[in-house]
From Swiss-Prot:
Gene3D superfamilies from the UniProt entry: Hypothetical protein apc22750. Chain B
InterPro entries: UPF0145_dom_sf (IPR035439), UPF0145_YbjQ-like (IPR002765)
Record Pfam families: YbjQ_1
Name of the featured protein: UPF0145 protein SYNPCC7002_A1337
Length: 108
């Protein structure tokens, strides 16, 4: 399966469009990790724990996107776009949201 952020695949012809595919990954935050991340942010350091979560989330979203495209009989997903965000859950914390979208296609 080819995954691409571009709208074409070099050297391949798109023979049919199988529709838009999406994937969402949501992670809950950990209060202790948030506390230490906040301290690190105040002194200007990078928060490796969150970087690892986002990297893992991007990989999981791409795997889910690929799986959804395979269910449609696609050979590739083009025009992939990824986004991240947060969802506030009352006073209980924040959820981290990672989304991926693209167009599933068959190649000739």
């Amino acid at each position: 399966m080819i995954l691409s952020t571009t709208n074409t695949i070099e050297g391949a012809t798109i023979t049919s469009y199988q529709g838009v595919v999406t994937a969402e990954v949501v992670y809950g935050t950990n209060a202790l990790r948030d506390f230490f991340a906040g301290i690190r942010d105040m002194i200007g350091g990078r928060t490796a724990s969150y970087e690892r979560i986002f990297e893992k989330g991007h990989q999981e979203a791409l795997r889910e996107l690929e799986s959804n495209a395979q269910k449609r009989g696609a050979d590739a997903v083009i025009g992939i776009s990824m986004d991240t965000g947060t969802i506030n859950v009352d006073d209980k914390g924040v959820l981290l949201l990672i989304t991926a979208t693209g167009t599933a296609v068959k190649l000739g």
